UniProtKB/Swiss-Prot annotation:
One of the GO biological process terms: translation
Similarity section: Belongs to the bacterial ribosomal protein bL33 family.
Keyword Ribosomal protein applies: yes
Organism, as annotated: Mycoplasmoides gallisepticum (strain R(low / passage 15 / clone 2)) (Mycoplasma gallisepticum)
Keywords, alphabetical: Ribonucleoprotein, Ribosomal protein
Entry annotated with the keyword Ribosomal protein: yes
Record protein name field: Large ribosomal subunit protein bL33B
GO cellular component, one term: ribonucleoprotein complex
Coiled-coil intervals: none
GO molecular function: structural constituent of ribosome
Length: 48
């Protein structure tokens, strides 16, 4: 079963992306993605 997650920009805390991942995975997802509010690539972390 897959779990829906939301990725949040670390700088402006804007919720920019949604994705899915396995429920068996225990580590939080951290990706470098483009933020339209910051107008640059920033670190996006998984929200709870």
């Amino acid at each position: 079963m897959r779990k829906k997650i939301i990725l949040i920009c670390e700088h402006c805390l804007n919720r920019n992306y949604t994705t899915t991942r396995s429920k068996l995975e225990t580590t939080r997802l951290v990706l470098n993605k483009y933020c339209s509010s910051c107008n640059q690539k920033t670190v996006h972390k998984e929200s709870h």
